Amino acid sequence: MLFRSVPALAEIQLALQSAAASVTGEQADALKRRLRTGTVVTYDDRNWELRFTQERRRINLSRSIAVDMESGTIAAQGYRLRVPYGTLLCVSDKPLHGEIKLPGAANAFYERAVGEHLLIGLATLDSLRRNRHGLHSRKLRSFDEPPFR
């Protein structure tokens, strides 16, 4: 079974935080209550939750803030190839905290949040594009480096 912790890139985190503040109008503590950035765990086994008691320790030791299967695949490959990537998740439940996601509450959340999340994602991309010459990370590589040639 594959278990990977995928760290966030600081440059992306800062652009995301700035865009979220701009779109939501929230600052400081109010924004911190809504926005979490950090390391995400990804698995290659869809049934990892069935072994949660065994997996909980690994998740805690990785200091990850989330477990995600789909965007984790994109992030793992972006990190491996040192290609800039970003994932903005619209989280409507807290399965690791034992809360149940009810259909009505999830639908109401998605109606409110999906448009806002899309605007945050687009604002983040605009910010990164405008400041592309200031982006620097040892985790990134340019498109003229292998394997892109």
Each model region followed by its residue ranges:
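Short amphipathic alpha-helical segments
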Residues: A8-I12, A113
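His/Asp/Glu-rich mid-to-C-terminal helical/loop segments that flank catalytic regions of hydrolases
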Residues: P95-R149
